[in-house]
Amino acid sequence: MPQYSKIARGVSILALATGVLGLEGAALAQPVLEEIVVTARKREESLQEIPIAITAFSAEQLARAGYKNLQELSGSVPGLQYSALGLNIPGRVQSNIRFRGMDTNSLGPTFALGTLFVDGIFVLGNTESIPFDDVERVEVVKGPQAAYFGRNTFAGAINYIMKTPSLTDYTGEVKASAATYDEYNVSASVDGPLVADKVGIRMGGRLYSKGNMFTASDGGGLGEESSRSGQATLYAKPTDELSIRLRGFYARDEDGPAAAGYIPGRLNDTCTGKSITTKAGQTATPVRWICGQVPKQGTAINALGGFKIIDSNTTVRSPQAFLSTGDPDFLLKNLIQKPQNAALAGVPSIESIEMERTMYRLSGSFEYEWANGITAVAQGGFNKQQINWARDYTFTPRDNAYSRDPQDLEDYSLEARIASGQEQRFRWLGGVNFYNQDFVSSLTGGDSLFVCIDTVPGLPIGTCRPNPAPATTPNAVFIGNNAVASTDHVETLGVFAGLAYDITDEFTLNLE
C-alpha cells in the first residue's frame, strides 16, 4: 500500500514561490509499514518526517499492486486525478495531471498546474508511455511546489525515481500480462556491472498493445492503442565521493480512433425545471444541461437521435466528400497527406484516422559528496516529442468535419545545487535552475476539412444535406493550414533555497 507522510509535531513555513503555512494532519492516521526515503525536496529525507503532503510508492509496492502506469496508480492517491483524456480531447494526446480538482482551460503544457518529473528533471508532454518497470519509487507531492520544482507545479508534482544500475550483481527480468480486448504488455530488462564496483548499466524495453473496445457504425475499431519503448541508464562511481548517471529513453505510440463520444445536453436535458444553489449562494435554473448522474451508453441520446454514444468515422474515404467532389480520396489527399507547415515538418506522417507520437529523452547528473556530508549536484535534461493526429472532429457517425492536429515540443533544463549534511541540527540547501521550452502546435483546430457545411432544416445541427455538387460549392471546403496559434517559447531562470532547524527532537522549523 502507499506510504503517507506524517507530521507529528512539525511546522513548515514555505516562503519564496509558495508562501503558505502547511500542516498535513490528515496523514497522522495512515499506517507506516516500512521506512521510505524520499527526495521531493532535493535531498534525502524520511517520508515520516518530511513536512509536506506526499504519498510515496516503492518498486515493491508498485509490483505488488500490479500498477503498470500513472493512470492505474492515480486511483490510489487521494486528490490526484490522471487519465489519458486531456480536457475535451479523447485519446492519449494531451493528457493532464490534476491535483484536488484544479485544472486550466489550456491545451498546451505551458499553463499546466501539475507536472511529472523523472529524477527531478521536468518531463514535457505525454506521461502515459513511461512504464513503471524501470521505476524505483514514485513520489506524489500535493500543493504548490514551485520553490523546488519550478514551473507548472502550482497544484502539485509527481517525481519518478528511476532504478540505479548495480555495480556488483547481474540480474534480468521479464514480465508479461494479458487482458480483455486483445491487450498484452511485455517488458524485459537486464542490469549489471560493466566495470566491477565502478560502472554499471541497466537496459530495458516494453511492448504494449490493446485492441478495439468498440466498433464504429462504419465497421472500424475504436480504442486501439500500441506503444513500444526502450531505455538505458549508465551509472558510474569512479570514487567514493563522485557518482555519474546518464539516461536515455525512446518511445513510439500508435493509436487508432479514440473510444469516446459526446453526450449533448440539449438532447439529454435533465435540468430544465429544476433550481440549484451555486457555490456563491445564488439560485440558478439551468436548461439544456445534465443534472445528477451522467446517462450511460445505450441510455443517453446521441447527436443523431440514436443511443450509440461511442461512435465516429474511422475511414479516410469520406462518402460525403465523394458526393461533393467525385473524388473518393478527397479527405486523404487534402487533409491526411497534405504537406505540413514548415514549422511542423518533422512530425510523424500518418495515413488514416490515427495518432502517432515519438518521444526522445536524455538526462544526466553528477553528484559529489564531501566527508562532512555536504553534497553538490549538477543535472540536466532534454525532451523532444512530436505528434501527428487526425480525427473525426464531431465523434459521431455523421460525415461532417475532420481535423489534423500536429505538434512539436522540445525543451531542455539545467540545475546546480548544494546541500549540507542531513544528520546535523541545522540544515541548508541552495540552487539555481534554467529552463527553455519551444512548443509548436495547431491544437486550436489545426488543418480542418469540412465536407458538410449546408444542413437540413428541422434536423439536428450539422446534419448533412446530400449534394453531389462540384467542389466549388460550400459542401466541401478546406480551411486552414497549421496556423500554429498555440506556439510559444518559454525561458525561466530560478533560484531556490531551504533552511531547516531542529528546535527540539520533536519540533522542526522549515523555511523554503
Predicted regions: what they are:
Residues 24, 65, 94, 155, ...:
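Transmembrane beta-barrel architecture of outer-membrane proteins
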Residues 28-32, 135, 167, 182-184, ...:
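Secondary-structure transition into beta-strands, especially the periplasmic turns and strand N-termini
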Residues 33-167:
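Acidic, small-polar-rich N-terminal luminal/periplasmic segments of exported/outer-membrane proteins
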Residues 43-45, 123, 179-181, 208-212, ...:
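Structural signature of outer-membrane beta-barrel domains
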Residues 159, 168, 175-177, 191-293, ...:
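Periplasmic-side early beta-strands and strand-to-turn transitions of outer-membrane beta-barrels
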Residues 177-179, 214-223, 259-265, 325-356, ...:
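Extracellular/periplasm-exposed beta-strand and loop segments of Gram-negative cell-envelope proteins
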Residues 244, 248-331, 437-467:
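A surface-exposed, glycine/aromatic-enriched loop/edge motif typical of exported proteins
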